[in-house]
Amino acid sequence: MSIIIGIDHGYYAIKTAHCSFPAGLTSYGEHEPYTRQGLLEFGGCFFVCGTGRQPIQRDKTVNDNYYLLTLAAIAKEIRQRGLPPECSVRIAAGLPLTSFGRDKPKFKDYLLRSNQPVNYKFEGVEYSITIEEVAVFPQGYAALMTEVGLLQDEPSMLLMDLGGWTVDLMRIDNAIPAADTAHSLELGMIRCVDDIREQVRRETGLSLTDAQLENMLAGQPCTGSEAVRDIVNRQGRKYTEHLLSATMEAGFDLHAIPAVLLGGGASVVSRHLSPKDGLCKTIFLLDDKVNAVGFERALAAVSRSKSEA
């Protein structure tokens, strides 16, 4: 029996139903690196997964980076579920609605390769994975399968998926995506964090890491002066204002329509919204793995429909 594994291939992080790790990948060629944490051995080469982040590339299929990160994600998810390292997998992945039709065939072929099973080693454990199927679903909308009640309670709502590089917007009317309203803003968390880092450097001379800035933005523990925290919070509010303004300019009236915010940036916006923004209603899905869970449920639903037909 095959296992369904949902994978959200973000610019900032790779997410499965139970795991999330940075989307960075460092190649060490044929030389084994100093660490086993995140260590992937594939095709006679060594890679460390989860260090830093991917350079922005519009087409994720231009090199093998996201394929290698997919193998790491499968290994992590299998281990988390307590499953054997030799198994068959059905991948449920996603793409933004703005590029869904164009990129879907190529992304499926990229993940579903002819050489099966795929043999590799991750963190010292040997895996033999047969990828039987790759199904691709719209990001954001698939995540709403984890909160079905949201679609039943409102005739219209705005879906805002705040990812690493883009914020993908789409209106949903009577539980059906209004595909002609799909819009993408290049205002994701990478842009937010980079702008804050630069502002902190200008005002204090300090160079903070992504991890430090992310924790401060999320209100999580992180050693740092009050001056730095003030800058981070001020810039977090500035980012939120910019995002709301850009969304309104894209034709979505946030004073009139409820908005569902999800993705890695949703927690930042949730902490920096103000009553003076006058938004109609905001609903936050703060688990950054919600898209991956939604992909799994979508594929399971499709499979049930086929078996019942």
For the regions a language model picked out, list residue spans one by one.
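Nucleotide/phosphate-binding catalytic cleft detector across ATP-hydrolyzing
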Residues: M1-M157, I176-R191, E203, D210-A309
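Conserved blade-register residue in beta-propeller folds
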Residues: T16, L169-R171
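Ser/Thr-glycine-rich phosphate-binding loops at phosphate-binding pockets of nucleotides
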Residues: L162-D168
